[in-house]
């Protein structure tokens, strides 16, 4: 008789846990509050966009990308069959990054792998060229990066976790360009965080992983899917799970955990207005932190003290808007980062990566390209209405985002974006408008302020049959990403394997990889750290 596992939440974390468990013979059911599975990663059929005989236009919460440092999620994808291959084979490389500024843009392309410290300095300098930053400040920033690369793990947790990125790079005393491009650039656009409060341990090392990918990842900076996410990944994933006997129950909202003694006895699930008890041997919560916080009652906190401070974790907004174009505008074979945009925009032009998608069969047949844009700063006033996105209507968000894109791309007599080429648009429906001045977000993003690690639990809680598979769990990845959710799921599965006495192979875990050239320096820094000395 196999053990029964109830997984709460059908996003990447929940589905990853279900996959790892089902592959090891567990009896798994997944409960998701939405009718559709996939969480933030899922595709969204644009309502009322399909003409008779055609498919709806594909929308999304935000574009998916798979940086070169992702290891856990690609490994899972390699085991999901799709058209005789695997969904991993539906990933294709992007090969360039567009660093766009108002009136100017720059392409960053891969370089050879640095072999010496001089090489590393030269490569870092090339990344930050043409940004209008004084050379002495660029060199100071490079020194800060090298400090991170040569610091031991113990110092990272004891010191850098509690230092804001803004302070670590001494941004307050530097030029506006330094503050804007090196201080705020990545934190705003990629992780929706403020440099003034972001943990150096998180932001600094994720910055480094992304930069290492820019410099020397084989094949390209990152991968993207070769079609809409559901078609290329989520639908085959759900088919694979059901083929292994996983039960997928949508429209099922977790309302409460019920304890008996030290164990979870049941979870109460709301299904269409009817509350039903769900019992299992083990429970995996793959719910986002803002939902899980509401389920952690005083008795749960007493039984699992590591969950007592989830309400101190913070979230911000990072949501997408898609622009549907009459004629495709490829821009660059990769992502674009709009450094001067008040709303911290990033984008990808998708058709070039979707060779097998028949665009004539989508919508009314007139769409020739899709520009998918993420908005990561919802609190800064825009350039059209002078209002932050949270105070804008949906139409104003569209107009503002489009204007910010044009201010970066339409330069030097070249006009890749024209109003006449824009057919329609779609804003992530998680952005909800009860009225124009009270916009809410149904799926915010966890952020990592300095010192917040202390509030984040391990995947294995003090309740013997309750485990966590969400991106707020402590992981190597350490960031609210699909990779972090997948890694958390693996950790929860390994804990269940231990608790059940299973002899099945444990799910593999990968620490973030860093260049070997710096290993002796990290070992030397460990000696200094143990002696109570600063990094030297």
Where are the model-predicted features located?
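Active-site/ligand-binding neighborhood in enzyme catalytic cores
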Residues: 141-265
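Dinucleotide-binding Rossmann-like beta1-alpha1 core, especially the glycine-rich loop
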Residues: 51-144, 155
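N-terminal Rossmann-like FAD-binding beta1-loop-alpha1 element of flavoenzymes
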Residues: 3-30
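Active-site-proximal substrate-binding core of FAD-dependent oxidoreductases
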Residues: 495-536
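C-terminal segments that line or cap access tunnels to active or ligand-binding sites in enzymes
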Residues: 215-225, 280-282, 287-456, 462-487, ...
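Glycine-rich FAD pyrophosphate-binding loop
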Residues: 22-49
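Conserved Rossmann-like nucleotide-cofactor binding loop
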Residues: 13, 36, 290
